[in-house]
Swiss-Prot record:
The keyword Signal does not apply. Pathway: Quinol/quinone metabolism; 1,4-dihydroxy-2-naphthoate biosynthesis; 1,4-dihydroxy-2-naphthoate from chorismate: step 3/7; Quinol/quinone metabolism; menaquinone biosynthesis. Its EC number is 4.2.99.20. It comes from Escherichia coli O6:H1 (strain CFT073 / ATCC 700928 / UPEC). The lineage of its organism: Bacteria, Pseudomonadati, Pseudomonadota, Gammaproteobacteria, Enterobacterales. Monomer. It catalyses: 5-enolpyruvoyl-6-hydroxy-2-succinyl-cyclohex-3-ene-1-carboxylate = (1R,6R)-6-hydroxy-2-succinyl-cyclohexa-2,4-diene-1-carboxylate + pyruvate. It is an enzyme of class 4 (lyase). One of its GO terms (molecular function) is 2-succinyl-6-hydroxy-2,4-cyclohexadiene-1-carboxylate synthase activity. Belongs to the AB hydrolase superfamily. MenH family. One of its GO terms (biological process) is menaquinone biosynthetic process. Keywords: Lyase, Menaquinone biosynthesis. This is 2-succinyl-6-hydroxy-2,4-cyclohexadiene-1-carboxylate synthase.
Amino acid sequence: MILHAQAKHGKPGLPWLVFLHGFSGDCHEWQEVGEAFADYSRLYVDLPGHGGSATISVDGFDDVTGLLCKTLVSYNILNFWLVGYSLGGRVAMMAACQELAGLCGVVVEGGHPGLQNAEQRAERQRSDRQWAQRFRTEPLTAVFADWYQQPVFASLNDDQRRELVALRSNNNGATLAAMLEATSLAVQPDLRANLSARTFAFYYLCGERDSKFRALAAELAADCHVIPRAGHNAHRENPAGVIASLAQILRF
């Protein structure tokens, strides 16, 4: 079994750019950014429970990493960058810390490196279970209307929230709930030490209005790019800013 993905081929000899979307997104999420890099071959992945991979279920991050590796092999991707947003960024960091063959580097936008104590993990588990129950049982428009009121999305205006609620409500609530629980921050290890000891290139992007993740970025041994005029979802709010940062990263 492999993950559903869309592949776009570029020039031979350059590494692939493998894009991983955030929770409730799909393979289209990164394409406005990715298509600015037509020289590179691009793979836009649907994570389990999402888009064309909605029927694929996992028990945890190890399953996701295994599926991602099988997917890369199926496309004969031997050299690649992982580029992930939020959940996709956490998947990228988890996979990269398992020393993937062929990995050139990781670019994470607004991805959490992991909670640092049992109390935080217990609180997050309670929260994610409550959200998962809502995703399973309530209309998605109602759930996402509340989802986008969370503090991390404070920089969104009303029009942006309405647009996101309409877009995300096309998902399957049950499969979102399953993926939310399987990849909860409550079950993700703290990756700070692994990332500090890494052997791969590591870059971190965050919106200038995303105070939570700017603070987290400061804790990581990563080259951080702050995206102007953007909050947590920087590649959606300022795609040109993210394109500029990614172009700078890939030039090294």
